Regions:
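Structured, non-transmembrane catalytic/binding cores
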Residues: 11-15, 21, 55-63, 123
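Basic, alpha-helical interaction scaffolds
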Residues: 31-104
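Short coil/turn segments at secondary-structure boundaries
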Residues: 7-9, 82-86, 99-107, 131-137, ...
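A terminal-accessory region detector
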Residues: 109-165
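Short, conserved micro-motifs composed of acidic
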Residues: 3-39
């Protein structure tokens, strides 16, 4: 069975202690050299060249902001806050949290995700006061993405027999 590799869509990436070392090109059986990349997309997750396994949150956050602005663009401030939050939870949050329970995120990554989440509420309720946003989220029973990801990670690890972090 011959499996042809599409060299235009195939990239090489190095993770580990020698991630920054320049490598020789890998050549396919057809004689086509595969490109080395600093970032690649695999199953919708952007993996970054690093000393440890690391993912990039730039594109998911960009997609999240696009989805959130789309919700505001469609319903604006015409719909009630409850409707907008329901749309936000069903259309925007999954874009931000896709597959992150399977990745180990740094504290700065989690803070970055929480910041994007909180900015939506600041825009919705027309405030820049984070305490007001936290009170609203608490009153509505809305958890920050870092908390949701913590719970999802535990479920993921238990379902696959992995040890808790």
């Amino acid at each position: 069975m011959d499996m042809v590799i599409n060299a235009k869509k195939t990239f090489c990436l190095r993770v580990g202690r020698r991630a920054s070392v320049i490598c020789a090109n890998i050549v396919t059986l057809n004689g086509i050299a595969l490109q080395w990349s600093d970032e690649l997309r695999y199953l919708g997750v952007y993996i970054v060249r690093s000393f440890r396994f690391k993912i990039s949150l730039d594109k998911p956050k960009r997609s999240f902001y696009r989805a959130a602005n789309s919700v505001f663009g469609k319903v604006g401030h015409v719909a009630s806050e409850e409707v907008i939050i329901q749309l936000f939870n069903s259309k925007c949050v999954p874009v931000l949290l896709y597959a992150l329970e399977a990745c180990s995120l740094s504290k700065s990554d989690l803070c970055s995700i929480d910041f994007a989440f909180n900015r939506f509420f600041m825009k919705l309720f027309r405030t820049n006061n984070i305490e007001i946003v936290k009170n609203i989220q608490s009153y509505l029973g809305i958890s920050l993405p870092s908390v949701v990801l913590g719970n999802r990670s535990v479920k993921f690890e238990l379902s696959f027999g992995l040890f808790a972090r």
